[in-house]
Amino acid sequence: MLIALFALAHLPIFRKTPLSASSSPPPSVHRSPRCGKASTAYHPPPADACISITASAIDAASGMSNSAEQDKPIAANGNAAEPQEIEVIHFQAQEKQCCRVIRSNKTKVLTSGGVHTRGSSKVKLKNIVDYKWERKYYYPGHLVAVHRDGKHLAYAINVNNKATGMEGMVRVCNIATSMRALIKGMSGEVLDLQFAHTDCERILAVIDVSSLFVYKVDQIEGNLLCNLVLKVEDPIANYVPEYDMVSWCPYVCSSSATVPINDDDDENQLLIWSRSSQFQCFQVKMIVSEHGRGKIQPAALESGYLKIEEDSLITCAALSPDGTTVAAACADGLVRFYQIYLFDVRNHRCLHEWKPHDGKKVCSLFFLDNINKPVEESYWQHVITTSDANTEIKLWNCSLWKCLQTINVVASPSSLQPRNFIAGIDRSANYLVLSCLDSLAVYVMQIGSTGGADSENRSSDSEGEGCDTSKRIQNVAEFKLSSGILSFSIVNASMRRVKNSIESYYPIEEPDDFDDDSNSTSALVLHMFVVQAKSLQECQIIYQPCVAEKTERSSLNSKRSQTPEDNLLIKEEPESPNSGTVGAVQLDALFAKSAKRASTGSSSAMVAVAAAAAAAPSAILQDATKEAAKSESPQLSSAYTQQVNLMTPDAFSASGTAAAAAVFVSTSTTTSIGTDSSTTTSGQDRSIDSAVLQTIRMLATVTSKTSENPNAEVLLNLMNNTLIEDREQQKLKEKLDARKKFIAIDRNPERNVAENLASGSSSPSREVQEIMATQDDADAYEAELENLDDDDDDEEEELANSSPLPEAVDGTWPIVKLSSHSAELQNAAQIMSQAVQNTNNGNVPPTLGGGHNNNTSVGSNSNNNTATTLSTSNTSSSNNAGGTCVDSSGTGELNAKMELLIDLVKAQSKQINKLENEVNKLQKQQEAAAALHSKQDTSLEPKNLSQLAYKIEMQLSKLMEQYLKRYENEHKKKLTEFLAARESQNRELRDSVLQVLNQYVMNHFTDIIGNVLNMELQRQLLPRVNANMDQLQAQMQVEIVQKLSVFDKTVKENIAQVCKSKQFLDTFGKSVLIGVQTSLQTAFIESMSSTLIPAYEKSSQNMFKQLHDAFSVGIKDFMVQFNTYLQHMPQPQAGSGNTEEINNKLSMLKQLVESSLHKHRTELTDAMLETQREVKSLEILLARQVQETIRAELRKHMEAQNVAMRSQAATPAPPYDLRDSIKQLLMAGQINKAFHQALLANDLGLVEFTLRHTDSNQAFAPEGCRLEQKVLLSLIQQISADMTNHNELKQRYLNEALLAINMADPITREHAPKVLTELYRNCQQFIKNSPKNSQFSNVRLLMKAIITYRDQLK
């Protein structure tokens, strides 16, 4: 009762406030939106959501718009606020409120912690496919794509193939007919897939690492067929996919076009493929018409194709709906807009370039164009960009290239890891959806348009001024999930009629399911398909979005009409200045007869205001009448609507599961103010409580004697003036804060614990328990405060719309009616006390009369009827108070209480009908009496009237004080009893909760703790351990490498010192000599016996055989000649003459034999010398072979020794490189040895290497050639072996080598002819094959020199 007195003392009718002070509510007062209380740090003063009076009309009516208020900065949403302040929206983990209004241009959204174990009841999930996808935070594209019809679905899967490794596939299915098809042939993982935005055809684009596939999905004879239309192969070398994506053009033809929309338009089949630092545009229809279906290379395309290279990695790309512009965002933060022209692959132009996020990488880019229907405006006027893993969201105006709004999504302070979000937008571009794998939540942001009327209220620094319409993110909603989302695809999002229950909504699928009497309301239905770690699910999010109080109904209607599925609006009719008809009214506001929660404060607040109005002094009303008369002008006439929430008896009998739920009826009434108004509307737009209306009518009767009938109407209409209502409602709300604290005793913290232990699904028993529970939450109380203000306005509207009661004939009429009014005042006080009591008790308030009846004007009533109604209400209230505690096993008792409650409501309804009939009769009698009294002289002296009014006021005040004191004492008693009952109830509930909690902990604590520990170990401990292990491994590797390098250096130094010591060299030489001696002797003996001796024996044998043959043949010839000579010689004569002749001949024979012997001796000597020279050459060759053999053996032993020594140091032996050895020899000046080693390798590349690194002047010095003859011959042979690569260097060395040949050397004379013949043949081949070579003339000169040398060697 103290709260009621406090509220009565601060009502508007007890204060004399100037009219100018009520033109606007105080800027510090914040009204909570209909969806609930937002815990925000920034509270700009909202304008009334139902007032549509222009600023000029308000200035004319109030006359108080000063320059100080006009100069205040105004935010983009029309609110006076500091532009530098940032609005903070914090979603709590356990709160029920899911949607928050965004009022500022800079907003920070704090997400919940993501520690919940169950999802929101507003999210409906239906399992489609069970498949395990890899759980990772970022996929470059979409894992699932849905066609525009919402029936055909495609999702990517990976199959491990033993032959080819991981193979990507795409499953296409029709969820309506359960037909499926599988697409194969992708190399590696499927990176992205998208359906084209067409209605008739189903065209699917799929990309992998190096290829683009376009398939056409057809349904033929009950089978789903996927036919390949186009395959573009364009691999990039050494490319690792990071931001690969494919996107179709969301083409929408102009609304002014006369040709209907055709799915075969070229723009419908335009797609963009972005990857690495390039993106490619393909016109599929044009390419197929020119090149046919199948594989194609981009290089072969001359039209229908465009490729653009960027400077850095492309993170995202999007096509405008008109198909003429593509926007590409890069990793360096730049976004470029290109104009595309597909008939020329080299023709493209950059339209604009800008950095939307100050150089930060742009993650997503969305054009805010409704692709569901044509529009009048040009496209891509607004765009949304995101950065920082889609946590920073900016809304841009592309006409001015300025930012309209910025929203930062920040993880809650309890979160340890930053959030990585994935983003998507629906086809109407009205809803932006964000999801995070860690937070286990989905965030929906509603994007709306602000019309030209709002543009007047924008600030001068608003980025969207100058445009007729501007986009704005109006609210954000958070929905918890049981598991995170890897990828999603949105089907559509629209406002629909849904069936509502206590905690959730269900969409009405068929039109026959809906009727005006069904339990339904209008809500947003977001339909999409989501991919989770273990399944693919169909998801529906159903909720009622928040609307800021300043947002007008017209803007909401225009925004909601953008979706083609939403046809639940009534078009706005034009209003005349003096008309009182209702404007654009939403059907969800007119026919939403129920809400999901009970409100315990609306009826009680309404009764409190009505009872307070009963004590209004008439003098104050007269002052208000004079001020209202001053503001009358033709320019002031305007219509406004006021939406209120009233509690009806239907709330207690609507359904079985929610029998005691409080139900609101959203109505709209319109009042016209003007000078030409002479009559008021007699019909009522909604039902009014009889007791409240009687009290207000009594005030109207008291004040009717002081003025004429039109002035009384103006006085009553003044009560509905919104300029006064706003200020008074705000002050009343401030005073009711104390009441909020007083009612706070109704909070029961144990209820949240019980709810958390309950199942996530909705059950009838749980809903009944929540309905009949005694505690109240913060959302219901906020709704109570709103309804209190709205009911006050609506009661005054009823007073304004009702006709005034007739006056009394003489002065005794007020005295006769005084007792009746006293009884009515007593009844009003009882109702007010009962409302306060019910509010404190947390019960559903009693429903007053007239909850169902419309168009009814209730006059005065008899005391008996009023007492009967009040007794019924008290009985209902007591029954409700007795049934607040519902035991889990008391279902029968609950049903009995429900039936009793329904019976009481029926009885009350019957009594209300009777009262209405009696009121109608009384009204007719009063009208007749008024007609009779009007004929008589009704003039009363002003003095008697003022005295009468003063007496009535005094009596009413005294009676009110008496009744308030009496009911205050009763209320204290009842409150004491209630607190005792409440304490016992809390004690029982606490015991039951503890028992249930203990049992639950004993049964599930181990499993839950195990799961939580495993999850936390994987999420928290494992990454940190891995990071520390990686650091430790890196440190160990660095230390090991350092230590190994130091150890290697030390070992090398020690080995070098040991090898250089004389003792080691002596020991090593002895050991090598001992080890090699036997092998060398054996090799020497074998070489002598197998090579030298046989060759010498063979040559000697041949020589002696030739000598024997020569002597034998010579002697035989001599004997033959000698015999012949003897035969021809004459017979010897006797005497001395013959003897002398014989002696002469013998002497001649002797000389001849001696000469022959001398000749043969000379030849034999020459042969022996030749043999000796050959033996010497063989000795030289043998000695060299023995030296090489010894060196090879020594080298092998040295290498074996080095390997053994290095193996002890645990380091690998360095590879032996001939080029390094040759370089060392050349640097040491051992040119012959270097060439010898290079020629022994039989590697022409090594020979060329030696030629390049040797100075020819040093090798062929003037004092003599430093190369041996065998080295020269080998060099000539190997250089001439490959004349195809002959060059100047080789030619120079050939010339020098030929000049250095020593013809006297036996080795040269033996082998030079063969080498020169081969060189001559190769030169001939070179001249034949390369006649135009630069070395042609030099080779010819070389050939002449070869001929000269060959002649010398012959």
Curated annotation (Swiss-Prot):
One of its GO terms (biological process) is mRNA catabolic process. InterPro entries: EDC4-like (IPR045152), EDC4_C (IPR049404), EDC4_C_sf (IPR044938), EDC4_WD40 (IPR032401), WD40/YVTN_repeat-like_dom_sf (IPR015943), WD40_repeat_dom_sf (IPR036322), WD40_rpt (IPR001680). Residues 788-799 have a biased composition (Acidic residues). Keywords: Coiled coil, Cytoplasm, Phosphoprotein, Repeat, WD repeat. The modification Phosphotyrosine is found at residue 1320. The modification Phosphothreonine is found at residues 563, 581, 1211, 1317. Residues 853-884 have a biased composition (Low complexity). The modification Phosphoserine is found at residues 32, 561, 576, 759, 762-763, 1207. PROSITE patterns: WD_REPEATS_1. Residues 554-565 have a biased composition (Polar residues). The keyword Transmembrane does not apply. GO terms for cellular component: P-body; pole plasm. It is found in: Cytoplasm, P-body. Its main location: cytoplasm. Residues 765-803, 893-936, 969-1036, 1159-1188 form a coiled coil. WD repeats lie at residues 309-348, 363-406. Residues 18-38, 552-581, 788-811, 838-884 are annotated as: Disordered. Belongs to the WD repeat EDC4 family. Homodimer. Interacts with Dcp1 and Dcp2. Interacts with Gyf. In the process of mRNA degradation, seems to play a role in mRNA decapping. Required for silencing a subset of endogenous miRNA targets. This is Enhancer of mRNA-decapping protein 4 homolog. It comes from Drosophila melanogaster. The lineage of its organism: Eukaryota, Metazoa, Ecdysozoa, Arthropoda, Hexapoda.
